[in-house]
C-alpha cells in the first residue's frame, strides 16, 4: 500500500529534527567540556565592584585584565579585613595584590614604507602566544600563536579575526591562518562555543559566527581536507547557536534562537549573564541608572548582547536613537546574523558532503533553504526597498537602513531584484566620500554615522560584486582605500575605524580612544588593493585615480552560485 503524502506539519517538523540530529552527534563531546573559568567580577565580588567604581584606572578593562598574585578568596578576605581601617589605600592594595597589564611596546615603523609594506611588517608585531597563563588570569590560553587587533587589546577577538585572516592569506601567511582556525576549534571543543574573545569575562557570549567562513578560507589552501577536519567543530558551534530549539513553541525565544508564529527559525544575539560587563563596569551601571523605568538586569543583558553583535553600540539597537538606555538588542532579529547562519548551514552542507555524509548534507541544505525564505519574508522592507532587522515586539521589519543590510548579498541569499534595489539604496544613503557609512544616524555611538568600519566595507564590496553591481562595489573600495591611504600618509598607521564623511580622519565615539594597529583594517586594505589593481600590476599604495571596473581584477569567489529565491 502506498504511503500517504506527508502533511505540512510533518514537513515543518523536519527543521528541528535536523538540528536535533546534530545535537545527538555531539553529546559525547559536550560531556567532556571542563568547568568554565570564572570572570573577575565573580572571583573578586565586592572588591572588583569597589575598584571599578573608584575609577582607579582610565580604562575599566585594566583591572578586568589584572592577574591576582594569590588565591582571589584570600585577597578578598584581606580586603574585607582592611577596607574599613584608618588610612586604607585602595590603590596601594591593588598594586600589592595584583599584577597589572603592561602596555605593549610602541611600534615605530621604518621610514618610507608603502601601505602594503607597513601592513606586512605589522603581522609579527600583532602576533601573541599564550600557551600557558597564570592560574587566576582572565586571559584564556590558546595552543597556537594568534594575531590581536592592536591598540588596547591583548587578546584575540572572534569576528575581527576573520577579516584579519583575509589579510594574512593575502600576504601568504597560511600558517598563521591555520593556527587561528586551530585556536578557535580548540575554544569550541573546550567551551562549547567561540567566546567574544579569549577572556573569562567574554565566555558568556559569542560574536558574529564566522568560524565556518574561516574554515572555508583555509580550504582555499588546503582543499576539502580542512572542511572534513573541522566539520565536528562547525557542527558543535551550530548546536550552540541553535541550543534550545527542540523545546520552542511558535512565538517563543530561547537564548539565541527565535521561533516565529509560522514556525520560521531565526537567531538573535544573547549573553547568558545580566550584570555589568567587567571591562565596562562603570559605564554599564551608569547606563542602567539613567533609565529607572527598566530593570537594570534587562539593560545589562541588552548591553552585553549588543557587544555579542560586534556593534557596540549603535542606534540600530535603540528605540530612541540618541539614548543608549533604550537599547533592546534581544528583541531584535538581526539580518546580518541570520545571513551568517545561512552561510554556516551552506558550508556545513558542503563539509558533510566532502566527508561522504550526503544525508546530513541534505539536512543542512534544507535548513539553509528554510532560513533563506525566512530572511526574504521577514527581513525585506518592501516599502523602503532594503533589507533590515526584524522586530520581535512590533512583529514587523524595522525601517532603519544599516550596512548590515548588505549581508544577504555577501552570502548569496538575496533575490536578484532585491540585490539591485540594495545597490541603489547603498549608493543613495550610505556611500560617503570616505567609504560606506555604518548607518545614517549621528548618535555619538561608534557603530553609527559618520564612522565606517573595514569589515562592513568588505562585506558590501563582495556582496555587490556577487550580484554584478561592480561599479558601486568599486566606489566603496576606492573611497575607503583613499581614506585609509590619506590617514596613513599623515599618521603612519591604520586605525580601527574611519570618519567616512571625509578622507584621512579616524573615527570617534565609543567607550575607549581610537585604536591603531589594526587587524581587520589591515586585512581588508590588502584585499581591496588586490581587488582594484590588475594582477599583472599589483599596487603597494592606493592609486591616485579611481580605476575603471574593466581594469580591476575580479578575484575568484568561494561562495556558492546565486540561489533562485
From Swiss-Prot:
GO biological process: cellular hyperosmotic response; trehalose catabolic process
Organism per entry: Escherichia coli O8 (strain IAI1)
One GO MF term attached to the UniProt entry: alpha,alpha-trehalase activity
Superkingdom of the source species: Bacteria
Binding site for substrate: 152, 159-160, 196, 205-207, 277-279, 310, 511
Reaction(s) this enzyme catalyzes, per UniProt: alpha,alpha-trehalose + H2O = alpha-D-glucose + beta-D-glucose
Family the entry assigns: Belongs to the glycosyl hydrolase 37 family.
The protein's name: Periplasmic trehalase
Compartmental location: Periplasm
Subunit-level organization: Monomer.
Signal sequence, start to end: 1-30
Keyword Metal-binding belongs to the record: no
Catalytic residue positions: 312, 496
The keyword Signal is annotated on this UniProt entry: yes
Enzyme Commission numbers on file: 3.2.1.28
UniProt function note: Provides the cells with the ability to utilize trehalose at high osmolarity by splitting it into glucose molecules that can subsequently be taken up by the phosphotransferase-mediated uptake system.
Polar residues bias spans: 548-565
Location of region: Disordered: 538-565
Alphabetic keyword roster: Glycosidase, Hydrolase, Periplasm, Signal
A single cellular component GO annotation: periplasmic space
Pfam hit, one: Trehalase
Gene: treA
Transmembrane segments: none
Top-level EC class as recorded in UniProt: hydrolase
